[in-house]
Amino acid sequence: MIARAMTKEDVPACTAILNHTVALGGSTAQEEPMTEEEFAQDHLVEALICNVVEVDGRIAGFQGVWPAGEGLYSIGSFTDRREPVPGAGRVLFEKLLNDCRPRGGEAILAKITSDNIGGLAYYSKMGFADFEIWPDDHQRPDGRKVDRIVKRFPL
């Protein structure tokens, strides 16, 4: 299992992972599927860093950070839920830390909807600490409002 920088060749596989997660519902604030063009713009152009984890030539997940204010990064992480690979998230985060630290900055923020139990557990396991709660910050397609939990990882 290796983590490396995302390339344009990875976009179809990563878009499929994202869109499958969106279709399952309840584990991301992303509610609408993305086209490959939208995904490439967001992850290859707007993201400061974006990596993939590859297992036997197959993309098993991706992770990136975007600017979130002075000295802060906002993280987004997705792993393939059709064929999960244990440890993929940890390998991605180790690579991301190695890429972020030389850039400087104070912290990485993870902004997770309160109904995303898996995401909350993942970021806690990676060492993120609870930082803020944004009440009723996100509305699900069925009209339910959920809090956003902000977790912080100091760099």
Regions from the PLM with identified roles:
Residues 35, 57, 114-115, 137-138:
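Conserved beta-strand edge residues that scaffold enzyme active sites
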Residues 67, 109-113, 124, 129-146:
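Conserved catalytic-core motifs of GNAT/GCN5-like acyltransferases
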Residues 2, 74-78, 109-111, 150-152:
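Short aromatic/hydrophobic contact patches that present stacked aromatics
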Residues 87:
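Glycine-rich phosphate-binding loop
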Residues 8, 24-84, 93-94, 99, ...:
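Acetyl-CoA-dependent GNAT
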